[in-house]
């Protein structure tokens, strides 16, 4: 089916203010002459067309610019990927940008949607490294990438006790990806950013077991790792020329005779001890290892991404990623990038007093809040802050509440969204210019 854009109203026969009309084998999307609103209308129209069973389309006309093409693609995408889109001719640079968005967005959405039976912790680490290598190769930067994957008992031997503790209950070994993108080729080059991602490839909740309804989508609990991998790949596509390190903390949280238990105490590399009061608050336990490693690199800034708390989703739904940080300037930079890329982020509170709300009688901190009515997203961030020396500056925590949709909306199909890839790449690039 051919799809065109029009600034004229649809005939009332298609309904008042209809965004779609049809003529033979052609559909017309009716715009409102408002740039942001029109992008949304195009994405909504794409969803409507998919809902009508249309799988193959050709976008026709000079009105199709980069942003309209991208909006249509986002709405037309489904997890089964049983569709085809013929895009109009764009200028070379714009065509490259569109293809890079699709390449990186598809990686993120595809790997999040993938079943846990095929995406083990080690596989996630391998696939992420392979994706970055491929992206670097496309842009003649393959020699800039080096990495290692630490897995199984080697994690415990090297002091990554959080990842090991959470993942040791599964036959699929836990793993940590440590990847260095260094286009300068100078081993002593300063690090612009360290990216730390939660890569829980399946989360049963452990002995604090989830109900079936809550567990059914837990193959997506590696969404933070996927998002940061996609963002780094997209930044490379846009010409990133400074050093960035990626740390993915990968594990399965299952029940077995070897799984961790409530009351266990983890001693981290930096000497902090943490009592496990809920095995379903495992994401922060694995991220701690990554944050310690990231902090030791003395980067200009650190970003961690994780599908960390239900509290963040309760606050903002699936429509925004939640941002928590004490660094107002860095948050401002992030929101500027989000505005430029037309992606939704929302700030949630994180203050010093939250750090006193995760007390333990047996360790330095506990992995859940210790007050009767606590701010779950904020206390989770507070836990993470114990693994960054100067937690008040140059650190962004993103609770990935917009990573995945359990039900479709007028903009998105069921499944992963890819929201955030462009914003985080934009942030890295903008910081690299300062």
From Swiss-Prot:
Catalytic activity: Release of an N-terminal amino acid, Xaa, from a peptide or arylamide. Xaa is preferably Glu or Asp but may be other amino acids, including Leu, Met, His, Cys and Gln
EC number of this enzyme: 3.4.11.23
Cofactor(s) needed by this chain: Mn(2+)
Family: Belongs to the peptidase M17 family.
Gene Ontology cellular component annotations, sorted alphabetically: cytoplasm
InterPro entries per UniProt: Leucine_aapep/pepB, M17_PepB-like_N, Pept_M17_PepB, Peptidase_M17_C
Active site residues of this protein: 210, 284
GO molecular function: manganese ion binding; metalloaminopeptidase activity
Highest taxon listed in the record's lineage: Bacteria
Keyword Transmembrane: no
Enzyme class: hydrolase
Keywords per UniProt: Aminopeptidase, Cytoplasm, Hydrolase, Manganese, Metal-binding, Protease
Name this polypeptide is given: Peptidase B
Disulfide feature: none
Subcellular location: Cytoplasm
Any one Gene Ontology BP term: proteolysis
Claim: Manganese is one of the keywords in the record: yes
Function summary: Probably plays an important role in intracellular peptide degradation.
Binding site for Mn(2+) 2: 198, 203, 221, 282
Entry binding sites for Mn(2+) 1: 203, 280, 282
Cofactor mode of binding and number, as noted: Binds 2 manganese ions per subunit.
Subunit relationships: Homohexamer.
